[in-house]
Amino acid sequence: MKNKKKKLIVILYTEEKTKLNYAMGMIATAAALERPTELFFTGKSVKSLIINNKNSNFNYKNSEELLLAIIDLNTKLTVCSGALSDNNIKEKDLRSDIIINIEGL
């Protein structure tokens, strides 16, 4: 039988730590229930995905653990190409240890 569950896409615009954790918590719950999921980073949230960013919000509480969990649960991570440009971030500046798709909104 074909999976008829609708995909949950959470668009994350802010780099606020608690909102990042909340978004990943929602995604993790849906993904654990075998619902297709995508976390779309735009606005200032793209800064969280920079390599060696000591100020990354993935250093907050269990954020890195949640990120790895949603990746293990097959969540698609997408970054807005316009947000990269607006924040003067190049594709090579993004973390290379995880698969990040770059697309337009």
Positions of PLM-derived features:
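Short, glycine-rich nucleotide/cofactor-binding loops
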Residues: 8-21, 49-53
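Short internal beta-strands
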Residues: 37-43, 77-81
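Short amphipathic alpha-helical segments and helix-helix/interface helices
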Residues: 27, 64-68, 105
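Short glycine-enriched, charge-decorated loop/helix-capping segments at active-site entrances
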Residues: 52-57, 94
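N-terminal glycine-rich phosphate/adenylate-binding segment common to multiple enzyme folds
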Residues: 84-105
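Short active-site-proximal "capping" loops at secondary-structure junctions
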Residues: 44-48
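A glycine-rich helix N-cap at a beta->alpha junction
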Residues: 55-86
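Histidine-anchored nucleotide/phosphate-binding helix
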Residues: 19-39
